[in-house]
């Protein structure tokens, strides 16, 4: 029976532990035998994803700070009650400062925590963009992913920084929270006209979801034929009878 193998197949090895140099009987290290922990192996498994490197690690730490600050504020808003935290989680929010604080650093309980969270989250996203860009250049790949991510970052910065800057206060920014940011979006839509009738909004959503589905279809198809060599798509794309050509024919026939 053939094994399913491709360049993305992760390999996990679990050999017998090496105990090192023989120690005198009675030594404490003799009793401390090494063990294998599956979860720790997944965390450090280089075959499951690329190594994070310095930029990736810095980005993860900054994101963790932002995540913890949001979580702590959510907990504080329900008097540190874990049951209420879980029950009310969709309604909890970390709000930006009120308009009267303009652009100054507001007191912690009046929007200061939101400003600090926004700083950590923004720096995390910018450092991660730098990580994606650098990895692509180091591997000799195109920087398409970095610039696609940059377009999403532009939307994030527009709503959370550029627009509030032009309007003169942090109160115009998006709050952190599930229903809170949806309520903000609904209010924004009512303020500037219904977004659902905006043709540019329609086109952006259509291209966003359409491109996501097309990329998923392509990636899934190539993975499905990778055991036949279809992952070598660049080399096979112009040849007849190859796995990549059969994959292309499948969708060509499907689309009519």
Swiss-Prot record:
Tree of life domain: Bacteria
Chain residues that bind a ubiquinone: 251
A Pfam family hit: Photo_RC
Residues that coordinate or bind (7R,8Z)-bacteriochlorophyll b: 181, 201
Regions that span the bilayer: 52-78, 110-139, 142-167, 197-225
Protein name in the entry: Reaction center protein M chain
Mode of membrane association: Multi-pass membrane protein
Native organism: Pararhodospirillum photometricum
């Amino acid at each position: 029976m053939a094994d399913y193998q491709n360049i993305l197949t992760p390999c996990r090895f679990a050999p017998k532990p090496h105990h090192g140099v023989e120690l005198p009987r009675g030594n404490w290290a003799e009793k401390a035998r090494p063990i294998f922990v599956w979860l720790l192996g997944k965390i450090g498994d280089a075959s499951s994803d690329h190594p994070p490197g310095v930029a990736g690690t810095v980005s993860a730490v900054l994101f963790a700070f932002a995540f913890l600050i949001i979580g702590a504020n959510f907990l504080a808003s329900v008097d540190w009650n874990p049951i209420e935290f879980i029950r009310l989680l969709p309604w909890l929010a970390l709000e930006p400062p009120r308009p009267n604080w303009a652009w100054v650093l507001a007191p912690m309980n009046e929007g200061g925590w939101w400003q600090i969270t926004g700083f950590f989250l923004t720096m995390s996203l910018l450092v991660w963009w730098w990580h994606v860009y650098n990895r692509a250049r180091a591997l000799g790949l195109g920087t398409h992913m970095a610039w696609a991510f940059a377009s999403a970052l532009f939307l994030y910065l527009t709503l959370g920084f550029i627009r509030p800057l032009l309007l003169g206060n942090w109160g115009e920014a998006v709050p952190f929270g599930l229903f809170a940011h949806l309520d903000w979006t609904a209010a924004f839509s009512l303020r500037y006209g219904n977004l659902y009738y905006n043709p540019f909004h329609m086109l952006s959503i259509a291209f966003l979801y359409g491109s996501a589905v097309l990329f998923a279809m392509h990636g899934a198809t190539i993975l499905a034929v990778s055991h036949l060599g279809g992952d070598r798509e660049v080399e096979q794309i112009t040849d007849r009878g190859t796995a990549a050509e059969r994959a292309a024919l499948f969708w060509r026939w499907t689309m009519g």
